Amino acid sequence: MKLHRYSFLARLSALVAAVASCATVSTGYAAVSPSPDVHAVSWIVVDGESGSTLVEHDADVERQPASLTKLMTAYLVLDALKRGTVRWDEKVLVDAADIGTVHNDEARMYLVSGQRISVKELVQGLIAASANDAALVLAKRIGGSPDGFEQKMNAMAHQLGMNHTHYATPSGITTPGNYTTARDLSILALRLTKDFPEYYTFSSEQHFSYGAFQKRNKNWLLGKDPSVDGMKTGHTQAAGFCIVATAKRHQASPPMARRVFAVILGAPTANDRIAGAGSLLNYGFSAYSDYSVTDPSGSHTVTRNSRPGPA
């Protein structure tokens, strides 16, 4: 009888552990089980300063990222601008081969063969309008060819520690071998914004226009939540609805600003994507409490402590 009772308790303990592992908060003190309202295949929330994971669900599942691929494209373009190998005001010639693979149902800014367009306008189209034609033109300018740019993308992913990511396109169109994870995208999001804070200038634009073309930024949190200032959305049939979102909010005690990043992959609808991102950002700001400490030398520090997760 004791043996059967022990076996039952062991199975019960294993079941409880498996359920708890579905969504956990990682802190320096303890793990708690939260209940953010998210409908998606995988997601993660990280602290913007330390990069610590606040909550996650299947964050290491490899998936097609759709236009979240453009975050790496943007990273490489901004890196080239920083290095001086390309200039913001440089006029890039659009070649027919660059845009010939962009279909009518893809996001684009309607570039035409033979025109010249500035790098700044291309970056605006890439980030705010998620334009695939802009991604391809920039990829050729930075990498020399699509293959050359993809090699740069994968080299940078390796350098940043994105160990479950492989790129096979600069635009994010469904392509075999193009995959990443929610965790890897959180790594990229932190590095992109820390290395190139000018990214916020483009990702916070609610509307994009180029000639007669106009498009609203699909990160609908912009304008609804004044603390949200980026970053990128994506959608394909294979990837579902995806988003990397970030917000910066000020707290009263101690007076300081905090930033949180949220990543969602594989939401079933655009509304689920936005609602889930908002829920995760709100949870991220409630997951930690900050308080100030003055050590014996008089130095002022801020200590981060965990709060219980929501019931």
Residue positions per predicted region:
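Active-site-adjacent loops and short helices of periplasmic peptidoglycan-processing enzymes
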Residues: 28-183, 190-196
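Domain-terminus/edge residues, biased toward the C-terminal soluble/receptor-binding domains
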Residues: 162-166, 174-311
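Bacterial N-terminal signal peptides
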Residues: 13-24
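Secondary-structure junction/capping motif
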Residues: 4-7, 118, 145, 217, ...
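Sterically constrained small-residue positions within well-ordered secondary structures
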Residues: 21, 34-36, 253
